[in-house]
Swiss-Prot record:
Annotated GO CC locations: plasma membrane
BP terms from Gene Ontology: transmembrane transport
PANTHER family cross-referenced by the UniProt entry: PERMEASE PERM-RELATED, TRANSMEMBRANE PROTEIN
TM spans (from-to): 24-44, 72-92, 157-177, 221-241, 251-271, 282-302, 311-331
Entry's family note: Belongs to the autoinducer-2 exporter (AI-2E) (TC 2.A.86) family.
Name of the protein: Putative permease PerM homolog
Membrane topology, as annotated: Multi-pass membrane protein
Higher taxonomy: Bacteria, Pseudomonadati, Pseudomonadota, Gammaproteobacteria, Pasteurellales
Subcellular location: Cell membrane
Amino acid sequence: MLEMLKSWYSRRLSDPQAMGLLAILLFGFISIYFFGDLIAPLLIALVLSYLLEIPINFLNQYLKCPRMLATILIFGSFIGLAAVFFLVLVPMLWNQTISLLSDLPAMFNKSNEWLLNLPKNYPELIDYSMVDSIFNSVREKILGFGESAVKLSLASIMNLVSLGIYAFLVPLMMFFMLKDKSELLQGVSRFLPKNRNLAFXRWKEMQQQISNYIHGKLLEILIVTLITYIIFLIFGLNYPLLLAFAVGLSVLVPYIGAVIVTIPVALVALFQFGISPTFWYIIIAFAVSQLLDGNLLVPYLFSEAVNLHPLIIIISVLIFGGLWGFWGVFFAIPLATLVKAVINALPQD
């Protein structure tokens, strides 16, 4: 066994370039895993700066706009959009969330009436003991949800201070990262291993693919949210922005997200309209929008993305989401692509 490990090491990891690549990745993983909470503002600023780099480079290289001016224009536009989101959309989402929570008791009573009628209408399928069991189970779930909501509210109040600090630090760090990009990269390169050519080569190969994926995913979220919001408005569905926002975020979790988000959409439509033609119109329109997203929008936006097996994508979402939460889910596919590229970069037999 020991000889096999030595043989594998000599074939795969004896190359100094491969060791340099693994050292960089290992350092990054350990830093994020153990110190992620401490360096979270830095990581957020780094990711957002990376996203803004493409429009800045476009203004700088193709329109001959000085980098400082391009940075100010793009950064200012980003701050403006962020202000609109937090000052306009977030209050609307909050109000619809409060409205949904206040309507939950009425929904619960309506579901009780519906369940109580089942033994009368279908005595051969369900009896009153089964209905009582369902009532007790739902009641326990609601009580547990209420306790969680109270804890979450208290935690949210405590996190307001952190949010205020982030709101100041992140834009400040973003601006200096964008303005002084060259100087910062030169400073960071001094701490990297000397045998880093392989790592740089792999990064250059993947950089465009990762950039295309991130921008494509953000565009997909925007398009899906807008389309579903229009659908919900047309049919007069309650909480349209809240549900549309949830549908938009569901694209971050491939395959699983679409299934999960269908449940609240269907339940809200059912409680509002019952089993009526309007209910089925909403379900059909929503299903068509999901089919168009999966079969038309995704292939168009991600035609340049590295092809990964669906099982690998799901496993990546579970692993990286478990490690790093929201950001792990968002970057699951780029990280899986990175792992694949690293494996391919190691010396072969």
